[in-house]
Every structure is written in structure tokens, then in C-alpha cells.
Amino acid sequence: IEDACLRHRYLRSDFLDFVEGNPGFLRTVADVVDPAERTYWLFSLCRYAAERYQMGVSTVGSEETLCLDENFHHYGAHVLFETSLDPDPADLAAYFEMAPTPEVLVHVDAPGDRCLTRQRDRGDDGSALPQAEHAVDEFSSPLEAQEKYRRACSLVAEYLGRVTSVVRVENTGTVEECTAEVE
């Protein structure tokens, strides 16, 4: 319980520090998630990104590299998936301009059927994506939803390739093979 209380306190403090340094964050996130049905969930993802980013920049040493998994740009793909039938990262230009730009963005991709199999193997039933507001009418299967999400992720990587280096990894091999691609 003590760890949970301390973690909550530090994360809250990190979030407030991030917002203080990025005063447009709250308005921008509220604007981009507004069209979605699951606005609280999307806002929570963006808050999580801000907390982890701020915690990282405030603790990383001068000789260290801050490496974040599932952060602002990853969550931008979630926002695109949830808010648009035809995802276009330019629709989130204000969001991507507000988000800290990484020196390198690693875009990891795998075929949709492999992603769903991995989700199921981890105990996830793969239903997170098909629960999007428009998913009931739009998708005939979880694979169709997964493919749309893959496309949103690829579009975000392509969009950000204009302002930063993007490393693309085809995640079809072993962990060692995929790691070697990044190195």
C-alpha cells in the first residue's frame, strides 16, 4: 500500500510539472479526444504519457538515454483510431506539436493476425480495439479493427518522419532479431 501511495503522489506531481511546462497540454488533449466515445480512457492515456515522460526527463542522467514505450505518439494512434473513420495524423497536428518530439521514434509493426494471436496469448481477448465508438458498425472482425489500428500507427510514424528519425522494425522474428534491428 505504501508503494502505491508514493507512486500516485510522485506521478501526480510529475503530471502537474509537465502541465506547468506545457500549458497547452490539457486544452489540446481535450480538443483531440472530444469526438471519441471513450474520452476519459483516451485522456487517461495522454495523462499517463505526460507522467512517465516528466518522470523520465527529471531522473535521467546526462549520459543516459530516455527510452519510453507507449508514449505520446503511440497514444496519438489510439486517438486517431477512436475518433476517425479515415485516420489522418494531420488532424492531430496540434497534439503532435505539443508532444515532446523524440530524437528517434521506433515504429514496431507486425501482421494483424500475429498481433491478435499475441494479445490472446497474453490473456487479452483482443477486444480493446473493437470497442471503439464506430467499431460496431465499421468492423466485421477483430482482425479488421487491428488492421485499422496498424494503419493508424504507420501513419503516425510516417507523419513524424518529417521531424525526427524513425526506425521501422518488422516484429515477426524473435526478440533477439527485433532488438538487433533497433541497435
Q: Each predicted region: which residue ranges?
A:
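ATP-dependent small-molecule kinase phosphotransfer cores
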Residues: I1-T83
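NTP-dependent small-molecule kinase module
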Residues: R120-E183
